[in-house]
Amino acid sequence: MLFRSDANYGSPAAGSTPHFLGALMGLNAGIDYKHVPYRGSVPGVADVVGGTLASMVTPHGDFIANHKAGRLRVLATSGKKRSPFLPDVPTFAEQGYPELTVEEWFGFFAPAKTPANVIAAANTAINNALKQPGVAEGLGVLGLLPLGGSIDDMQKEIKAQYDHWGPIVKRIGFTAES
């Protein structure tokens, strides 16, 4: 989370986890926190650094360099524990907002009719790639930690995310048209 004093925030896209996290933060803080959707994180981070956007909610790999260079201040991370990439930045939970704990994740998806053997082979290849030397370091530059896992793990994660975010999306009144 990047923040100035104005009550607006950017996110990399409408309907993204950062969009909903910012909206939830505004609701929990009792402020009218206006969303400014961007097409990706880079333009929003540039606007925070340039002073034309008050704050940005985005994956931390998108702003670590600006934080370390002192061009912006990161006030919180949303993980369960402090990020190994930003150990000086407290979590929302540490600051009294445990409901803002979110572990953002990325997955690989294929069309619904992709044969099961192709999905299984892709899953094996991805898990093997994540174990290769240098992959963790490369992902770390982006602020990511490789996890890997089974197809069942991914299905459980998707359901858990749906169960978590569904009520929040309804609470803030977001629709695909909004």
Place the predicted regions along the sequence by residue:
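Conserved, function-defining micro-sites of small-solute handling proteins
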Residues: 1-178
